[in-house]
Amino acid sequence: HVIANPVQQLYAKLGLIDAQGSIGIFTITPSEGAMIAADVASKAANINIGFVDRFNGSLLITGDVAAVEAAMQDVIYTLCTYMGFAPTNVTKT
C-alpha cells in the first residue's frame, strides 16, 4: 500500500524519525521476502528503507510518490517473476 501524503504525526508513530514524502508498506510471506524486497526496492528507485523486520515480513519504504510506486512495482515484478510469489495490486491513499 502507498500512503501518498501522510500527516507528520504518522512518521513518528511508525518510528520514521527523519522520514518525509510517501510511505510504502509491504507485508510479505514468507518473511525472508522482506529482505529481498528491501534490496530490490533500494536499487529500483531513490527511496529510503524506513523499517524491515525479517521475522514478520514487514517493510516500510519512504520517498517521493513516484519513487515509492516504482520501487513497489519492481519488488512485485521481481518476487513474482523470479521467485514464484502470487501477484497483488498496489493500493494507494
Predicted segments, located by residue:
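C-terminal low-complexity, charged extensions that often adopt amphipathic alpha-helices
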Residues: 1-11, 87-93
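Catalytic cores of large soluble enzymes that bind and process phosphate-bearing ligands
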Residues: 2, 25-33, 63, 67
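N-proximal short alpha-helices
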Residues: 7-14, 44-48
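Short glycine-/aliphatic-rich beta-strand segments at the starts of folded cytosolic domains
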Residues: 10-29
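Short, glycine/acidic-enriched capping/hinge loops at junctions between secondary-structure elements
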Residues: 12-14, 38, 72
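Short, flexible turn/loop "capping" segments at secondary-structure junctions
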Residues: 17-18, 51-53
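C-terminal binding/interaction regions
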Residues: 43-48, 54-93
